[in-house]
Swiss-Prot record:
Residues 116-275 form the CP-type G domain. The keyword Translocase does not apply. Monomer. Associates with 30S ribosomal subunit, binds 16S rRNA. Belongs to the TRAFAC class YlqF/YawG GTPase family. RsgA subfamily. This is Small ribosomal subunit biogenesis GTPase RsgA. It is an enzyme of class 3 (hydrolase). Zn(2+) binds at C299, C304, H306, C312. GTP binds at N163, K164, A165, D166, G217, Q218, S219, G220, V221, G222, K223, S224, S225.
Length: 343
């Protein structure tokens, strides 16, 4: 059934109602915060944001008598937007409720624009981005390449992870192996695992130990199943593929941080069906295609668009097989979408 189109007045009314609801929620939260700060608060201490629930977050105490315990905390109004992985300064209050009073500097942050084009951080202090894909839903090179550009832009090390390797068959196998070979030749670390059968999970765990990682990828690729296999006590709900679309159903509604027994953390984030790059420049995209780097600036014309121009270094490399058509198509698609991407 076609999606019903709303006119301008209907859209305005919906936005007005949503704005009023948000204002009422913020007012209730501010009242609760004032009551909390009016009581006795404990000393300032360090904490780690392990989950975010709208106007409140869960903070794990990092020092003091309550180290390792989790507290629900309110946010002071003057704080910037906090995300899972943030290190903060907080004070404990009554009944296990606390107040975050400051945000510590971030070493890295993974951001994406919201529907209004404003940058929104989705995870902080991460050093490894695990790009998850699977035989179904069908993996799209363009989406993988967008994640690789985002990783390069954020200064994160990427790990490509093919989950559900047990679903590889004679029909989808040739295409999948050709896809993987492109990234292997470029030197990207790549693992094939099956969270369902356990194949390759030990090698994955070794790659994650000692790092703060985030899983990204389409819904339905098995991110929650991977978390359940790596951390059986996490209890992350698993969703099936939607029968009518072949796309995954969302199961994780907020980013949550989990600890590994041997050190390191994992942030499980909601499924992202399309990863836009409206917040990066053309130069950032070019940096994200590592095999293109030495070619930029060597074309005959300084303003070469790498389309049909004579003397184009990229087109020459494409003809000679030094650039794969799959990657060239992704590059062109991403460049063309820079001014119109939305999430």
């Amino acid at each position: 059934m076609a999606k019903r189109q709303l006119n301008r007045r209907q859209n305005w009314r919906i936005e007005k109602i949503q704005g009023e609801r948000a204002a009422r929620a913020a007012k209730r939260e501010q009242h609760a915060l004032q009551e909390l700060e009016g009581g006795d608060l404990g000393p300032e201490q360090l904490g780690l944001v392990i989950a975010h629930f709208g106007v409140q977050v869960e903070v794990e105490a990092q020092d003091g008598e309550g180290a390792g315990q989790v507290f629900r905390c309110h946010l002071r109004a003057n704080l910037p937007a906090l995300v899972t992985g943030d290190r903060v300064v907080w004070r404990a209050g009554n009944q296990g409720i606390g107040v975050i009073v400051a945000q510590m500097p971030r070493s890295t942050e993974l951001c994406r624009p919201n529907n209004h084009g404003q940058l929104k951080p989705v995870a902080a202090n991460v050093d490894l981005i695990v790009i998850v894909f699977a035989p179904a839903p069908e993996p799209h090179p363009n989406l993988i390449d967008r994640y690789l550009v985002a990783a390069e832009h954020a200064g994160l090390r990427p790990l490509l992870l093919l989950n559900k390797a047990d679903l590889i068959n004679d029909e989808n196998g040739p295409g999948l192996h050709a896809l993987l070979e492109v990234y292997r030749e470029l030197g990207y670390p790549l693992l094939e695992v099956s969270a369902h059968q356990g194949d390759g999970m030990q090698r994955l765990q070794q790659q994650l130990d000692g790092h703060i990682s985030v899983f990204v990828g389409q819904s339905g690729v098995g991110k929650s199943s991977l978390v359940n296999s790596l951390l059986p006590d996490a209890g992350t709900r698993v969703g099936d593929l939607s029968e009518w679309s072949g796309q995954g159903t969302h199961t994780t509604t907020t980013a949550r941080l989990y600890h590994f027994p041997n050190g390191g953390d994992l942030i499980d984030s909601p499924g992202i069906r399309e990863f836009g790059l409206g917040h990066v420049s053309r130069d950032d995209v070019e940096d994200g295609f590592i095999e293109f780097r030495d070619l930029f600036g060597t074309c005959r014309f300084r303003d070469c668009k790498h389309d049909r121009e004579p003397g184009c270094a990229l087109l020459k490399a494409l003809d000679e097989g030094r650039i794969k058509p799959q990657r060239m198509n992704s590059y062109r698609s991403i460049i063309a979408s820079l001014t119109e991407d939305s999430y």
